[in-house]
């Protein structure tokens, strides 16, 4: 509400709709799908009756719809018999139950879009987590060119669909068959992009400033392969 109030008289970039989407996993997943991308199978859990709705995926991860990050507000659920207890443990807060995805890699693409509609993507990077915290990023991601192109196209489509002016990191899963699923959005500079300060033509922070200030976007070519821990 505060961002929308400010936006009535002053440009806010990214626009308040991006904050609105990113604050709630239900809205985020609906937004991603509306943009033409796929997500892991999921169902919203908001009331007790939702615990027995058709189409629930097990095993799965029950995540609070809001205020969850770095593994907080998440519980693994092996079967339908465990779901009610897990929901109780999360305080019966609105949640999403995501089906577990057998992915081959976790990647992310950071995309910038200017007020003029120009778009620049940083190359896809591979991310490794330890205890839900990013531990290592490899740039560029060691994936097939066709998969990289697919990931970049998804990120660009999401940026255009949401009329982004700014920067958004699109976290994705790569499946064994080359399919790419979108996991989360972060409309800001992202920890998986810090490598760009040392190994990219334009780093993510400069690109963010350029995009929100109406300056031409910088090039995103990798100057040398990078590994960040």
Task: Give a label for each model feature.
Residues 1, 15-16, 25, 35, ...:
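Fold-independent oxyanion-binding glycine-rich loops
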Residues 178-181:
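Conserved protein kinase catalytic/activation segment
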């Amino acid at each position: 509400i505060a961002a929308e109030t400010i936006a009535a008289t002053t440009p806010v970039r990214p626009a308040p709709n991006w904050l609105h989407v990113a604050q709630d996993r239900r809205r985020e997943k609906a937004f991603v799908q509306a943009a033409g991308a796929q997500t892991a199978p999921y169902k919203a859990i908001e009331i007790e009756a939702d615990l027995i709705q058709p189409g629930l995926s097990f095993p799965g991860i029950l995540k609070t719809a809001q205020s969850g990050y770095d593994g907080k507000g998440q519980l693994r659920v092996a079967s339908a018999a465990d779901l009610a207890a897990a929901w109780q443990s999360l305080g019966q807060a609105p949640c999403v139950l995501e089906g577990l995805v057998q992915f081959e890699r976790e990647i992310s693409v950071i995309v910038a879009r200017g007020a003029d509609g120009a778009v620049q993507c940083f190359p896809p990077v591979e991310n490794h987590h330890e205890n839900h915290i990013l531990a290592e990023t490899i740039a560029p991601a060691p994936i097939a060119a066709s998969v990289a192109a697919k990931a970049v196209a998804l990120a660009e489509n999401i940026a255009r669909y949401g009329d982004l002016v700014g920067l958004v990191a699109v976290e994705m899963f790569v499946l064994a068959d080359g399919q790419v699923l979108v996991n989360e959005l972060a409309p800001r500079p992202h920890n998986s992009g810090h490598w760009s300060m040392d190994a990219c033509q334009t780093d993510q922070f400069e690109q963010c400033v350029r995009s929100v200030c109406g300056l031409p976007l910088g090039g995103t070519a990798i100057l040398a392969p990078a590994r960040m821990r």
